[in-house]
Regions:
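Carbohydrate transferase catalytic cores enriched for Leloir-type hexosyltransferases
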Residues: 1-368
Length: 368
């Protein structure tokens, strides 16, 4: 088969969706002999030199602004991918909306439906397009890819997609190389948050809980926040520059994949208090590095962590502060959580994801 994958979310700084698509493409090309092409478009950003060779793919790059192309595709259903990038058997979108196609089987990706349950906490483009179009696009798709059984349930129950058209491609655990602790982490470790600073990540509750932790335990390790900021994060960033958090909380900005492992190597605990998560790749990364995880009990996080994490209501500031104090203060609890996380992470493989994706593409072509 000739496959085209929309790679645009991974073109710049790879966060959740971009990292998922990047690793899925890499696993797929290693596991199959299909001809894979990645599609990128941006007015300013170009694919890195050698990207195609590194992934084992062809690259089609167009100097079209992302927002312009998205508006045309989502609102006008034009131009078809054949006009933009050529003819393929399958075209795979990394998001819930179809890429227009005359001939290719159309595959979409849905991790969660947060844009339906809490649209005011999403970006403007998502608020504009996704709630109105997602259900119709999902029902028209020849196959829907999701990363968890939680996501599969949302797609079948809320969007009305038949279960046999939804394929769960769980991300694989990263193969960490046991690098040393990052130089900006003290020997006592750190409380770590990794993720884009968007509203649903619920960083405000983390800051509240960390402030309470420091009241109870002034010697608590620093809080490091690793992730790209957004306009909505301005209030959080102001808070960490002022007492009582100033000097104890640091925003590192986006940390690329090759440096993130060193952050985990020096972390005492990862905290992920999200209001919703379609997967929560950072929880899997932390478990793979032997770092205890405290996470919310929302979305896919209970499924992903599989009993290895401390789970809390994302609005429970006192509960989060107490959970942090327990792991910071008790080496035995921290070690038990680390062991459980390593065992859970070992159940996630990219080989399995690639095999499921191959079946999704094969079935999609048959339904075309």
């Amino acid at each position: 088969m000739r496959i085209l994958v929309d790679y645009r979310p991974a073109l710049r700084a790879r966060t959740g969706v971009g990292e998922y698509m990047h690793q899925l493409v890499r696993a797929y090309t290693r596991a199959t002999r299909d001809e894979v092409t990645i599609f990128t478009s941006s007015w300013k950003n170009r694919p890195a030199a050698g990207l195609g060779a590194a992934l084992g793919v062809h690259v089609v790059d167009r100097r079209i602004p992302v927002r312009v192309l998205n508006y045309l595709w989502h609102r006008a259903g034009w131009p078809p991918i054949e006009t933009v990038a050529g003819r393929y058997d399958v075209v795979h979108a990394p998001h819930p909306l179809l890429i227009p196609a005359r001939h290719a089987a159309q595959v979409i990706t849905i991790h969660d439906l947060f844009f339906l349950s809490d649209p005011e906490r999403t970006r403007a483009e998502i608020r504009r397009d996704y709630p109105a179009l997602a259900a119709a696009h999902a029902r028209r798709a020849h196959a829907v890819v999701t990363s968890t059984e939680y996501g599969r349930g949302l797609v079948t129950q809320q969007l009305g997609v038949p279960a046999d058209r939804v394929y769960v491609c769980r991300p694989g655990a990263p193969a960490w190389r046991s690098l040393g602790r990052a130089p900006n982490i003290p020997r006592g470790g750190c409380v770590l948050f990794v993720g884009t600073l968007e509203p649903r990540k619920n960083v405000g509750v983390l800051l509240d809980a960390y402030a309470r932790l420091r009241q109870r335990r002034p010697s608590a390790p620093p809080l490091l926040i690793a992730g790209r900021d957004t306009p909505e994060a301005a209030g959080w960033l102001r808070r960490i520059a002022e007492p009582p958090l100033a000097g104890h909380v640091r925003h590192l900005g986006y940390v690329p994949d090759e440096e993130r492992e060193a952050l985990y190597a020096g972390a005492r605990v990862l905290v992920l208090p999200s209001l919703d998560e379609g997967f929560g790749l950072t929880a899997l990364e932390a478990m793979s590095a032997g770092v205890p995880v405290i996470a919310s009990n929302r979305g896919s996080l209970p499924e992903v962590t599989g009993g290895a994490a401390t789970l809390l209501e994302p609005t429970d500031v006192d509960g989060l502060a107490a959970a942090l104090e327990q792991i910071v203060a008790d080496d035995g609890v921290a070690a038990e959580r680390a062991r459980a996380g390593l065992a859970q992470a070992a159940t996630f493989t990219w080989d399995a994801a690639a095999a499921t994706l191959r079946q999704a593409y094969t079935d999609a072509v048959a339904r075309r």
